[in-house]
Amino acid sequence: MSTTTAIDDPAGLKTTRQRNNQPQQSEIPLPSPSISDVDSDSNKGDDHRDAHVKKAYGRTPDGTGMHTLLSPSQTHDMVSQLLDPREPKNLSDYIVLGVLALHIWLAWAVPAPYNKYLLGFAFTFWRLAYNAGIGYLLTVQSKYTLLVTWARRLRAFEQPATNPRPWLYNLLKTELETKIPKDYKMDEAPIEYNTWLAFRRIVDLILMCDFVSYCLFAIVCAHTPEDEGLGMLLGRWVGGIALVGFNLWVKLDAHRVVKDYAWYWGDFFYLIEQELTFDGVFEMAPHPMYSIGYAGYYGISMMAASYDVLFISIAAHALQFVFLAFVENPHIEKTYNPPPPRLRAESEIGSQTEADALVTKELNGNSDIPQPVHNMIGSFDLFRVTDASSLIIVACFIALTVVTPTTRTYQTLAVVNAIFWRLWYSVGLGYILKKQSEKKMYTRHFLKFGESTGEAWRQWKGLYHISMILCHVSFLTACWKMYTYPEDWSYGSVLLKHVIGVSLIALQLWTSSSIYESLGEFGWFYGDFFFESPRPPTYNSIYRFLNNPERVLGAAGFWGLALITWSKAVFVMALVSQLLMLGFISFVEKPHMQKIYGQNLRKEAGLTKFVKKSLPAPVKRWQQGVDKVLDETKHFAEDFIDAALTRLSAGSSNFVKDTTALFHKPLRLSINRIDRDLAGYDPKHYKLSVEGEQLIAPDEKATRKESADARVPKDVKTKVFQYGAPIRVKWTAPANHSKKDWVGLYLVTDNRNRDFTEVPSLGRWIPTCRGQYDTTTDEGIVSYDEKVKSEGVEGPLVQGEMVFEGDKLWWTQGVYEFRYHHHGKHNVMSISEPFEVRIPLVVKEGTELTIEEAENALLPIVRNCLDRDPEIAPETVDEPWGAHVERDGKYAERVVYAIREMFAIEFSPAVVPADGNVKKLAWRVVNGRIALAPYSMSLQSRRPPTPVADSYK
């Protein structure tokens, strides 16, 4: 039920995501059978997680942090469970079948066109129930184990003797044990496994209704277009049946590989002790159940000949990718790709790749100097000449395109201009790279004038980037000139051509994004032509399936634009772009790769290997003969070209903007303004006290800007705590207080009402007692409900203690307070004294700062920003911080905010993971202040303090 993430694999033999076993917290030995790539869904992800074995072994975390050994029972897919008369049936099966029958009856009984609207609404409902509903349940289970917590709180699987809901226990026992009659007993299985089996019944209902409502919607929308010829009719049905058949094969092969464990997102509940292998459909495409696994939707759309079906299919397909990005991928990253342990020695710092480290050394000549983090791609900056030039070029092209008339002359000029820049981008830059590979021509030019290799690299990146912009913008402007807005969108295949064209453009953008994600800045700009590569090639991301994805998919957008414009000239431009791209790969990239990597290059990509394995024996023998002839012909052609002329080359790289928006919404409490059961609770019996790490003493608050009286030290009680330091809260309440009471942290200015909290806590809250909410909210509870002496108070009192740290804190300066709330609501029973969280100003603007001072000031604040976690936070200025800093941007945001307040200098968050330790960060701070010193506006060091007359005492 999840997606596959590739790992570096030079040999290309094991290119799937490496599955990291859970920490060995138990000494019980477990078998480790092989496992294949897993998929998710009846339309789900593609993680290889189940085994080709009859019995698998897994672990579920229990309350002590150890793991319980379990042996998952044999289960069956939902279709056979529902429709196979040999499989036992229970109440939930009959409910699902009844709902499906209701859908079929509605399609038959409701007259047209109302049945189409009704079924379209039904499919939309079930699709949202899948992507939003199941997605929400899986997200809270992954983050907070909330489904298991709900089951435990309801006592759903407890014996009737102690269960307040015996009817629920009996219902679940009958439901689950009926489906698995052989090797499953609900009373003996862990609660995580039982919860997963119950969750499956909900999934069965949603997925079956989703599929049936879609098919019924397609049936009621199906029609035969007017004036459709026999050829088009046969083409539609043959193509549609082929796509549906292919989709069916993808699903069956995926289920063969993953079984029910991954099909129903089993690893959100427990983990199986197995390793991943790479098999079947998962060798064909990335995320096959999200990509090629939806081919059947478009096959059904073809057979129905309905744009309504096509558009609803595209929307449903897009929602699956949203589900992948926001539900499955975060869980996979968390479960199978945890950050590596923090390195302890400076020599082991791994915050930058070997390639980037090599470039940094060449650029700076000193490995101790932090590497640049201002990448060319994905960080547009008008202060950089390359980006400013690109913006001006694009603006000029747009202006010329808009103001000039759409005549044949200007259309011709636009097409010629586009072809010229394509030739320059492919042939011109290809020639430069070819000579750079053979003789280091580009680098030698800069060395001749006393420049460095780093300067040559920087100039090349700018040249390549601007050339890429010119190539693609000129192509787009030519398409604009050749495009004619349709007068009738329903005429012929106008709408279909636009849909396919936009899809091809999206495919090229995704391909470019995947290539950049895999290669990085170094590979995107052909860094191995300028620097010796420190490692063999890796095959992850899209390269896991294709050796040269740009060869096949890199020009998809050009053909999409050709379809949209339906212009012969644009078709010619697309063909020229495709041919030049193939030439660039053959005559520039491939020879250079052979030269520097040699035998380390992979012979066949995943898709090629899969296709060859699937061929019958006679076809394999014929294919081998054809390969031999093609190889001989190719060698002859290469020798002929070498002897006849200087080989020029062509190539293409596609502009990509790597954007990822992962929105993390902290846990919230719903606001209920009125609580009816406050009677009997006296706010005077509730109390909060706060303790933390003091930043400054009270008498340090006086400066010479106050009057003379104000400068006299007072008994100031306001507490000032360190930024990011843990804060301990002690509470006192009556012994009969609600177990769902909770304490939240707020800015003093956020709430005007002292009796009721007006704003949500946004995750900054902790319950007073354990076990009342999900497990993650209990983090921070130190003690609770400890009896205390209650002199002069009616009734006994209890007390507890909690610690707010990490994400429970607000990571901005300000004046805060804690509020004690009653029974899970927002009625306030007590408010703590206000306290301030402040970052000390280490050095004022315009004054000098040494590296040692910067290091000493940064180390404690950086440790606070990294939650003082031993796996993340360094102990010394030389130690690197953990890999979590690079994965989770919140840590870098905290650090750069603190630096801005401490040193009056602003950095991008990207510098924090790039620097890797406090020493390099301090070097950057000091040198940044030195660079800004001549422009400092501070007059504080030159002007006397504000005078105060003693006569005004």
UniProtKB/Swiss-Prot annotation:
Its EC number is 2.1.1.17. It is found in: Endoplasmic reticulum membrane. Residues 1-93, 139-201, 251-279, 328-384, 434-459, 512-568 are lumenal. One of its GO terms (molecular function) is phosphatidylethanolamine N-methyltransferase activity. Residues 18-27 have a biased composition (Polar residues). One of its GO terms (cellular component) is endoplasmic reticulum membrane. GO terms for biological process: methylation; phosphatidylcholine biosynthetic process. PANTHER family: PHOSPHATIDYLETHANOLAMINE N-METHYLTRANSFERASE. Belongs to the class VI-like SAM-binding methyltransferase superfamily. CHO2 family. This is Phosphatidylethanolamine N-methyltransferase. The gene is CHO2.
